[in-house]
Amino acid sequence: MRRLLNVFVAVAALGLGASLFAQSVPEINYDANADILSLPSFGEVAGVATNSKGHVFVYARTGHAAATLGDERTFYHGGSRLFQFDPAGKFVKEIGQGVYSVNFAQQVRVDPQDNVWIVDAGSNMVVKFDADGRLQLVLGRKPENITLRTGPGMPARQIDVPPEGRGATAEAGRGGGAGRGGGGGRGNAGAPGTGIPGDNFNRPSDVTWDRAGNIYVADGYGNNNRIAKFTKEGNFQKSWGQTGSGQGQFNQIRGIAADAAGNLYVADAGNKRIQVFDGEGTFKSQITGIGTPQAICVSGGATPYLFSSNSNDPESIENGEIYKIRPTGQIVGKFGKAGKLPKEFGIVNAIDCRTENDLWVGEIWNWRAQKVTLRR
């Protein structure tokens, strides 16, 4: 009986220790302001980013995409909008009006040269605008809805490409051939686990760059589950990754960020971890204990930090926090929780962190962008 009691006490102590460990992440004090930007309503804020002058860019899902019908094609467009604000929050202009790629917002980023990049999961494109909003580069291709005529008097064969990133048929898009990309629908992405290489995407989720200007696209919301690398001119170089839970495998990539040392941090949401790679795709380490990473960001400055949001279900009040992490993987602290009030978060899909204490976060479920200031 005494032996059983000792075992019970030991097990209880282990459980208590685990509970204490789980609660040992320090809380970071912070302030937040959701009323800075002048537009009254965005819709779902999928992306928020700032440039070196303090201007704020918001890429939001403002409504269902419209369909323009033609004799041969149906074009889906207009489901999202990209807004620019000055440092005081005053609306400056809208960027990308009428651009074919703007359909279903997924992310916006600003590179070191102040170019503005959007990632669109509906058109399966990554688009670069210069600092003045002029279109400079397009990666990927939006599959068309085309009526193919097979000959005089022959019935038409319809290639149907639905809007907002849903699966297309295997024939749609440039990526149908072997060794090309996901094209934009599940049919072109191949069976789960294949990680098909190429320069087309299947619902891309994020983009980042290294110091040489190479471009890295997280091709992660479809079933490609890979990172695609391009030169700064937009030429495809290589890709790595496939569906799975091992090193270098992914289960829904929701974000990617790079630090000055060339490390790439990949939010592997389905596996509840952040994987770290070099620029050639060599696995280096992984970070766990941070929930389900949704949005990630690496701060500037002499001592960079990684920020990662814990994705929360719309009805959940158990998480939704943002973690502050050293590049070594050490968790410094966390702040925030799920909710709709100021200083609470409703699925943070975007984090901008020019410094370690001044952040912007974009929220899907609360339809807003909050400016967050961490207290020193």
What are these regions (language model features)?
Residues 1-4:
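Positively charged n-region of N-terminal signal peptides that target proteins for export
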